């Protein structure tokens, strides 16, 4: 059995790879490992709007109850809400059934510990080992020792909306905002929060039917929102993904504003408020070099991690940083939540736009994005480190780096799932870096033939 858990829980095509049987086993093993020694543990269960959510929830909950835990089912709710509410309700763990930005046929199961953090690799391995060993040494409970399912009546959504609203001071009166809910988990929470803060709210893709989640909508397909913002003279647009742990924005001219710009704007604002701990933002190696240049001008440090919000969070926790995130719109505000939170991000951004008195596009001028080229080089899995070993490749990388002279960079990343290395170049001249990236990718491919 290979590793069951990926970077974001267990994911696969629902009813084919992620079966009801597997969901039952994950519920049983997860509840047993995460609540060992607790008399009558409570586990919070939420999901996004996918049609397969009901099937997987039934199976997952059966597994949880079989080891004597209580399952508190809160229904459709954003992933970051489960992270927050697990702490607020003093639950022993939280689980979300969602495949985030993936198409409808996929689903996933992701656990949070009692503090609202994603699980460590070690805990995930313990859950997998228990399943692999067919629940050896797990007692079979009967009678009154079996757990109960508790259907929650909407209080969880109310508590999460109140929490999200509390992260900004004042209201959003006078701001005209367009929201794209991706027909996903934010279709109630984000709309209500913005309305209650007195923004003028326009909404698209907020009618989930179980199969339209992420379909030509949300943060992965923001084209309709870009058009809508301009057509309706909105001050800004905000696009969520299926489980609302990420948010991208649209300025009043219809331009897509990615996570790098959001980090730059929010980082500068936190510094102004004296809340940017150690004067640092945490980004990944894939963040645009333009972000580093912009932050340097603001006398803000950038620290880089591997790609993945879990690595960003690790770095933030280790050194007590206030903000970090990815280009994709996973932004973590450690003062507020333990994971990327689309609604919290959207509210911070909207509040900054309102308070600044500037247009959103003016605020975005803080940063100039450098052209970026990404080329895949086909490389056998056992030779993915060739760029570190081969002298000619190393020499070519050094030459390119020298010629870019601080206003560009070379980044090579082996794919974790395919026989590829990704060659990424950034620089001021699109044509030049395009040629260099393709040349370097070709050199790498030729060396493994």
From Swiss-Prot:
Q: Which PROSITE patterns match?
A: PGM_PMM
Reactions catalysed according to its record = alpha-D-glucosamine 1-phosphate = D-glucosamine 6-phosphate
Annotated active site residues, numbered on this chain, are 100 (phosphoserine intermediate)
Q: Which UniProt keywords apply?
A: Isomerase, Magnesium, Metal-binding, Phosphoprotein
Residues reported in the UniProt entry to bind Mg(2+): 100, 241, 243, 245
Spell out the InterPro entries in the cross-references.
A-D-PHexomutase_a/b/a-I, A-D-PHexomutase_a/b/a-I/II/III, A-D-PHexomutase_a/b/a-II, A-D-PHexomutase_a/b/a-III, A-D-PHexomutase_C, A-D-PHexomutase_C_sf, A-D-PHexomutase_CS, Alpha-D-phosphohexomutase_SF
- Which cofactors does it use? Mg(2+)
Might you name a Gene Ontology BP term for this protein? Answer: carbohydrate metabolic process
> Which EC numbers does the record give?
5.4.2.10
Is Magnesium one of the keywords UniProt gives this record?
A: yes
Q: Which residues carry this modification: Phosphoserine?
A: 100
Record text on cofactor binding: Binds 1 Mg(2+) ion per subunit.
Q: How is it modified after translation?
A: Activated by phosphorylation.
SUPFAM superfamilies, alphabetically? Answer: Phosphoglucomutase, C-terminal domain (SSF55957), Phosphoglucomutase, first 3 domains (SSF53738)
Q: Name one GO molecular function term.
A: phosphoglucosamine mutase activity
Protein origin, superkingdom: Bacteria
- Per the record, GO CC terms? cytosol
Under PANTHER family, the record lists: PHOSPHOGLUCOMUTASE (ALPHA-D-GLUCOSE-1,6-BISPHOSPHATE-DEPENDENT) (PTHR42946:SF1), PHOSPHOHEXOSE MUTASE (PTHR42946)
Q: What does this protein do?
A: Catalyzes the conversion of glucosamine-6-phosphate to glucosamine-1-phosphate.
The family assignment reads: Belongs to the phosphohexose mutase family.
- The protein's name: Phosphoglucosamine mutase
Which species is listed as the source? Answer: Clostridium botulinum (strain Langeland / NCTC 10281 / Type F)
